[in-house]
Design a protein with these regions (language model features):
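A short pre-motif secondary-structure segment
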Residues: 28-32
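Short, locally clustered residues in the helix-turn-helix/winged-helix DNA-binding domain
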Residues: 19, 33, 65
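Intrinsically disordered, low-complexity basic tails/linkers immediately adjacent to helix-turn-helix/homeobox/MYB/SANT
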Residues: 74-75
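The N-cap/first-turn positions of alpha helices
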Residues: 24-25
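DNA-recognition helix of helix-turn-helix
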Residues: 40, 46-70
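Acidic, proline/glycine-rich intrinsically disordered inter-domain spacer in sigma factors
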Residues: 1-19
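Residue-level signal for the short linker/turn that defines the boundary of a DNA-recognition helix
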Residues: 36-37
Length: 75
């Protein structure tokens, strides 16, 4: 199944939050969740280790979850 980020990627707020992660994290997220690229392809295209891409994705997801849940509390 899709995760929260994949399901809500079209949502403007989620998109802006992803972009606020900054490079290279935002590019990794766009490649992974918007264009559905494989992690090994992302690592090759960006010149990063596969483990680096995985780490940045999981850290970024944690950050996004925190930012998005904070935003929900404010709504």
């Amino acid at each position: 199944g899709k995760n929260f980020i994949e399901e809500n990627f079209h949502n403007n707020y989620v998109w802006e939050t992803v972009m606020s992660l900054g490079e290279p994290d935002s590019e990794i997220f766009v490649r992974r969740y918007k264009f559905d690229e494989k992690i090994k392809d992302i690592s090759k295209a960006m010149g990063l280790n596969i483990s680096t891409v995985k780490t940045r994705l999981s850290r970024g997801k944690r950050k996004l979850r925190k930012m998005l849940s904070n935003a929900e509390e404010r709504l």
